[in-house]
Amino acid sequence: MKTTIKLGLIASCLTLPFGAQALEFAGYLRSGVGTSTGSGKQQCFQLPGAQTKYRLGNECEQYAELELRQDLLTLDDGSVFSVDAMASLYNRYDRALKFQGENNGSARMPQMYAQWSNLPSLNGGSLWAGRRYYKRNDIHISDFYYWNQSATGGGIEDVLIGGLKYSYALSRKDNLYQKEYATRHDFNVAGFKTNPGGELELGLSYIAKAGGRDTNSGWALTAQHVQAAFLGGKNKFALQYGEGPGTGLGYTGNTTLDKSSKSYRAVEFFDWQVTPRFGGQVEAVYQKDVRPGRQDQNWMSLGVRPAYALSEQFKLVTELGHDQVEATGGTRKLSKFTFAPTWSPKGPEFWARPEVRCITPMRPGTKRPSARPMSWRRARRCPTPAPMARRGMGRT
């Protein structure tokens, strides 16, 4: 066995292996310092009604994850019993490092679970119970977890039958902000071969009626196609539909909504690495929310982050993102541009980590139907070195 230690800088990943007794330690950290012209402190931008923001130079918090995983027992049949625990720390830039309080930050345990994996009786599948990150699908440049079944519960995962992998999870709470505890059932079937290098996965979520007053049941359906070896990277296309509490799509939504409330979403994004020095990621998201009482809303998001390496360790990274929300009262728009000279000691590729970036994000003022002409605002940020890195900030 070996232990994997992941180290890095600023939303980046670096892996260093060395011998140990089946213990794995992983960490993630992002941190930085910055200012904004006219206000002094760094500002971050997100359009009201948009579910995400483009994150390069647009994250105003310290965030860390510290994870330990231990294989406790390996049986004669090859199955392995293991435990996993993760602590997370969150604190806003303009607050003292207290990691507590609604306006300051938090210290949590987003993962603490046990798993019995590689079971012959399940054709290599596994059993698990606890709180864990589970089947998370996200877009890196906007940190959008559009299909995320992370939860507190238990389940059966990746049981191979007839060339397909079947999974089922039962949970009660799937994110920090879920007010009503509702029983959620998640069914997944993966491995449909659609074309050379392409696979389809289907997922169905059913949310039972919660215990509070005026709550309802709901459901959501997701279909996702993944195309490997696409321009040197990977392409993902997902269609999602939900009703009632299922309108949360990737999460449990508002439990007071009934079947007259519906949400539709289309997600398309891909990575590319057409040469060793030129790579990036591009995304397009469209979501339509149907609500009673003329509370409908449409959200569209387009973004791209190309990276070109001038040398083996120095990149020029840019990010351009645009969000548009059509809602009661008119249409809102927000565009953001970021330029980031980047030191990348592990190589020139887009996904090479760690990275240290000196960031200059700019955005025009939010545009409304009666707004004045837009003007650009700029913030400068040169992040401080961070000792750990691991991809993603979970909401469980």
For the regions a language model picked out, list residue spans one by one.
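Solvent-exposed loop segments that connect transmembrane elements
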Residues: 41-49, 176-180, 212-214, 244-259, ...
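Transmembrane beta-barrel architecture of outer-membrane proteins
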Residues: 59-67, 108-111, 149-153, 182-186, ...
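Beta-barrel outer-membrane channel/assembly domains of diderm bacteria
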Residues: 2-3, 7-123, 271, 305-308, ...
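Short loop/turn motifs that connect adjacent beta-strands in outer-membrane beta-barrel proteins
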Residues: 19-26, 69-83, 119-126, 160-167, ...
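Detector for outer-membrane/organellar transmembrane beta-barrel domains
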Residues: 187, 192-327, 333-337, 343
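Surface-exposed coil loops of outer-membrane beta-barrel proteins
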Residues: 32-56, 96-110, 121-211, 378-388, ...
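A contiguous, mid-protein "functional segment" used to position or interact
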Residues: 332-343, 355-363
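Transmembrane beta-strands of outer-membrane beta-barrel pores
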Residues: 31-37, 72, 87-93, 131-135, ...
